[in-house]
């Protein structure tokens, strides 16, 4: 007999999601949300950051996506939100205009929440955050708003595999599916092609 799946974020203790949001915003003020450890107050400036993202996330596009794994796509698509900018500098990136040039528009958490609810209304089976590592606070804030307004589908964290442990702890029991796109098993290649240190240690 089929059972109804309930997303992890709906099972958090009362007030826990808000606490995670508050913690994440504090970390953004001395940013250590990825292993770059830029320690820049991103609520005030993007100068000195690698990801070039500030207090507001930049969204390149959102909509039902049918190019993901079949278990995510189902019949109506994976509800994908593509975030602009990135904490990696991959020379081979297929979305260079998004990840390196930052094409897209700034979106407040309320707007991202509205996107999530729209994707749910369109029948998408999940919310798929693509390139999320540098916008964890913004995502958590949006999830908190969307959950209060009726979001009831699973969350997918579609990452490049360069996430700080603190970020993963903030996302624990919020995200349902982690989908790391691991790019390197050789540290020298990570430095050469993505200008990143400790990549292999970070994704383990």
What are these model-predicted stretches?
Residues 11, 29, 37, 79, ...:
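Functionally constrained cores in energy, signaling, and assembly domains
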Residues 47, 51-177, 186-187:
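Conserved Radical SAM active-site core
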Residues 170-179, 184-204:
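C-terminal scaffold of the Radical SAM
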Residues 1-78:
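Flexible, acidic/Gly-rich N-terminal and inter-domain linker regions that tether
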Residues 22-25, 103, 130, 181, ...:
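Short N-terminal micro-motifs specific to bacterial/archaeal maturation
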